[in-house]
């Protein structure tokens, strides 16, 4: 039963990933009306999934934590502290306090 539950949550995460991908694409074309609407949709979804204790891991601007983050790159950035997350490639998620997918991040050197 628990394995099926995690499969369902991972499918929800895949949907959120697709929304993020569309958001990034629309943002590249400066389509603020579309990105604003996507932000509203994602905010609603986050509220709903929060009620079932599926939480997006806060990453951008935070410091790298190997328990919840997966470092996929390191870049020089003099405006950030060492090991501070400067970019999130893929959001991570926790279910009831347990990581079901770490956030893939790029950190400052």
In which residue ranges do the predicted regions lie?
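Structured alpha/beta interaction-core segments
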Residues: 12-102, 106-109
């Amino acid at each position: 039963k628990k394995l099926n539950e995690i499969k369902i949550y991972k499918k929800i995460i895949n949907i959120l990933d697709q929304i993020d991908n569309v958001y990034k694409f629309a943002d590249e074309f400066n389509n603020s009306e579309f990105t604003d609407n996507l932000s509203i949709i994602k905010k609603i979804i986050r509220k709903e999934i929060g009620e079932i204790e599926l939480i997006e891991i806060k990453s951008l601007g935070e410091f790298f934590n190997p328990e919840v983050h997966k470092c996929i790159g390191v870049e020089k950035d003099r405006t950030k502290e060492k090991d501070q997350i400067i970019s999130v490639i893929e959001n991570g998620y926790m279910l009831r306090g347990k990581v079901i997918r770490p956030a893939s991040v790029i950190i400052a050197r």
